């Protein structure tokens, strides 16, 4: 038994923890949970816990349904919202076959596999997400437009605002769980908020994002309001994204930094960026996986609709921040295409793999875009070689299903299930008769 397992067992006993929740996600990024009693924890570390894998989206086929959930003791934390004298803890888990092999449908394993390839090349992949979400008043009929809890705007200080208190409570709870937060503030939309997690390796950050979503939902329930990570909940307000800052380190050195080069970008950084732009359309269905995601991408308000990069250009898909231009360890690039309901394990897998492919293939990064890409004409964008991202889930899926690259990164099992599920979602959406159609056409047609 290793020290992390011993720590978890000792803490459970000393803190009188009565339930240990074992967390994992399905292929779509939905959190799954099973609770075990303290008496079962040691056996769970040694042998795992059996479950029906076919009952979880994309995990396995019915004919191969016996699977094992194996807790990762390094992720052990007490859940603050389940406090009291008899508390609850949680751990993230890896999914294994009865033979002890990683499940092909486990998103956490997909990311571990991508990180292992980076490690073989001497790289550690760090990410830093800026997570946006809306706070609405509770309502019973969600077919009607939601009501934001305030009318604040970007960086607004709203005295005695429920949103300000909400952010404070969220940050405090995250830090109780060992999740460091850099910033929190009101965003541009009414009732829209942003909380930025401190950078960490991609696997830790993906786990933290799943915890973050749960914390936000728990606090909203306690306070009688509704928190939503929906990418575009309001037609006339900015959508919610999850802009993510990316960096590669070689040991203690930032591989993206080279003093004296344009924007202090090393050749490694330029090739990594070129790889992401090269594969951007192929991976779009993974980074933006819902029908609603494309209403954010194509809704303006600094959303990135076109495949380009720029220095301090928030209309670009990939931005090179220059907050601290002379500080090597701060060198990074910001991918602005992600939304907050992406499966973080799969999203970070395809982003890392795309960047590494750029390095392996020695791809050349084109010229940066300084213009607001939305203000350019189609002819101007074409002359500059700027291509659009897919404008719908359907368009994104048609590109992804032809991609050997994405199939290789996700693995055929997860790749095929993801496509099948998302094609079904598009078919369901396409078959709807919307309120817009009824209002516009029914009276006169």
Predicted regions and their residues:
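Glycine-rich, acidic/polar active-site loops that bind/position phosphate-bearing ligands
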Residues: 1-445
């Amino acid at each position: 038994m290793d020290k992390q397992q011993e720590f978890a067992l000792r803490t459970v006993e000393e803190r009188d923890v009565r339930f240990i929740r074992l967390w994992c996600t399905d292929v779509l990024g939905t959190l799954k949970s099973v609770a075990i009693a303290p008496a079962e924890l040691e056996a769970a570390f040694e042998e795992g816990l059996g479950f029906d894998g076919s009952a979880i989206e994309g995990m396995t086929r019915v004919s191969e349904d016996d699977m094992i959930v194996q807790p990762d003791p390094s992720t052990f934390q007490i859940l603050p919202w389940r406090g009291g004298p008899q508390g609850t803890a949680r751990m993230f888990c890896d999914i294994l076959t009865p033979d002890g092999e990683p499940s092909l449908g486990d998103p956490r394993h997909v990311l571990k596999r991508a990180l292992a390839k980076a490690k073989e090349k001497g790289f550690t992949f760090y990410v830093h997400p800026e997570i946006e979400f809306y706070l609405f008043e509770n309502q019973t009929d969600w077919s009607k437009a939601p009501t934001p809890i305030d009318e604040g705007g970007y960086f607004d200080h709203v005295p005695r605002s429920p949103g300000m208190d909400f952010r404070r409570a969220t940050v405090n709870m995250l830090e109780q769980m060992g999740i460091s937060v850099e910033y929190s503030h009101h965003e541009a939309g009414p009732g829209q908020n942003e909380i930025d997690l401190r950078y960490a390796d991609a696997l830790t950050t993906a786990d933290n994002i799943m915890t973050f979503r749960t914390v936000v939902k728990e606090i909203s329930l306690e306070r009688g309001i509704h928190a939503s990570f929906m990418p575009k909940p309001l037609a006339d307000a900015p959508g919610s994204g999850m802009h993510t800052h990316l960096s590669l380190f070689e040991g203690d050195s930032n591989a993206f930094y080279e003093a004296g080069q344009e924007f202090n970008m090393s050749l490694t950084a330029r090739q990594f960026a070129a790889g992401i732009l090269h594969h951007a359309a192929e991976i779009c269905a993974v980074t933006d996986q819902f029908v609603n995601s494309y209403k954010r991408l194509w809704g303006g308000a600094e959303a990135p609709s076109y495949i380009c990069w720029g220095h301090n250009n928030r209309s670009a898909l990939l931005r090179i921040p220059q907050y601290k231009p002379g500080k090597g360890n701060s060198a990074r690039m910001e991918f602005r295409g992600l939304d907050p309901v992406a499966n973080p394990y799969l999203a970070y897998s395809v982003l890392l793999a795309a960047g590494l492919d750029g390095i392996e293939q020695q791809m050349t990064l084109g010229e940066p875009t300084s213009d607001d890409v939305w203000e350019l004409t189609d002819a101007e964008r074409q002359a500059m070689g700027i291509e659009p991202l897919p404008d719908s889930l359907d368009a994104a899926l048609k590109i992804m299903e032809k991609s050997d690259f994405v199939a290789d990164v996700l693995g055929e099992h997860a790749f095929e299930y993801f496509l099948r599920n998302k094609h079904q979602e598009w078919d369901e959406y396409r078959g709807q008769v919307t309120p817009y159609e009824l209002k516009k056409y029914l009276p006169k047609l």
